[in-house]
């Protein structure tokens, strides 16, 4: 068990990354970009040191980061006790990505994966990518893991009778939780899962209310107009059932 005095963690955004092809240049570029985008902060916080690949990156860019021995000591002594990250999607990478079809991603654009479906905002849905990332993170750090955000932003329709039918959200959550359970069977020490988010709120990436994540609907539009009345979506009852079964009942 985790000691009661061990409460330090980190929170980061993490997307699984795959090379676009088996061409060595694509594989190497994917490795480098995954280091820069996915591992830099967690390596600092969970290994207690600035990774060598970033030292080289700064040097080649002509950047001098003034890191004192005192700073390095703080990093070494302040290693986080568990891993926390958000997962929404995956992306592919290439040494020639500027010549490939792009899609929207979490705050950035990414190369589109032809094998995956996308949300209305271009985020590519990849439940297997969650299992993949959990295995990667546990193999790298050997620390307990919490998934702190996972969900689907979508346009939800409020029906005349007050109901909101969102089977697409249920499918997204069920498929990701199923893959999380596979990661647990793989031996990954997953301690918790938190979907994003329980109630509709303004999207941080697009600043829209119409991009809804919640299992509770809020009557407000992109311009702040509405009654703010809250209504349960179909996904509310489904997620309630999922929680009560500790993720064992994923039936739609």
Model region roles, listed by residue range:
Residues 4, 8-252:
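Active-site region of glycoside hydrolase catalytic domains
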